[in-house]
Amino acid sequence: MSDFTLDFAEGDAADTVSPQITSKSLCTPGCITGWMMCNTVTKGCSFTIGK
């Protein structure tokens, strides 16, 4: 079972389609990485950007 729902929805224009990506993870709802970025201290997404 995937952590993401990759659903497509029609846009405002007749010929356009836009993806609707949502996380199913309970720890990080809406986080694009799902449970892999689960941070139990902040209860949300956490990203580390380094060189």
Curated annotation (Swiss-Prot):
Propeptide position ranges: 1-20
Keyword field: Antibiotic, Antimicrobial, Bacteriocin, Lantibiotic, Thioether bond
Signal sequence coordinates: none
Activity control summary: Antimicrobial activity depends on the dehydration degree and integrity of flavucin.
GO CC annotation terms, alphabetical: extracellular region
Domain of life of the native organism: Bacteria
InterPro entries noted in UniProt: Lantibiotic_typ-A_Bacillales (IPR006079)
GO terms, biological process: defense response to bacterium; killing of cells of another organism
Cross-link position per record: Lanthionine (Ser-Cys): 23-27
rRNA-binding is among the record's keywords: no
Single GO MF annotation: signaling receptor binding
The record's account of how the chain is modified after translation: Maturation of lantibiotics involves the enzymatic conversion of Thr, and Ser into dehydrated AA and the formation of thioether bonds with cysteine. This is followed by membrane translocation and cleavage of the modified precursor.
Annotated TM spans: none
Cross-link Beta-methyllanthionine (Thr-Cys), sequence positions: 28-31, 33-38, 42-45
Family of this protein: Belongs to the type A lantibiotic family.
Function in brief: Lanthionine-containing peptide antibiotic (lantibiotic) active on certain Gram-positive bacteria. The bactericidal activity of lantibiotics is based on depolarization of energized bacterial cytoplasmic membranes, initiated by the formation of aqueous transmembrane pores. Flavucin has high antimicrobial activity against several pathogenic bacteria such as S.aureus, E.faecalis, E.faecium and L.monocytogenes. Is also active against the Gram-negative P.aeruginosa.
Note: A heterologous expression system was used to produce flavucin. The gene has been fused to the leader peptide gene sequence of the model lantibiotic nisin. The construct was plugged into the nisin expression and modification machinery, and produced in L.lactis. Growth conditions that yield detectable antimicrobial activity in C.lipophiloflavum could not be identified.
Protein name listed in UniProt: Lantibiotic flavucin
Organism, scientific name: Corynebacterium lipophiloflavum (strain ATCC 700352 / DSM 44291 / CCUG 37336 / JCM 10383 / DMMZ 1944)
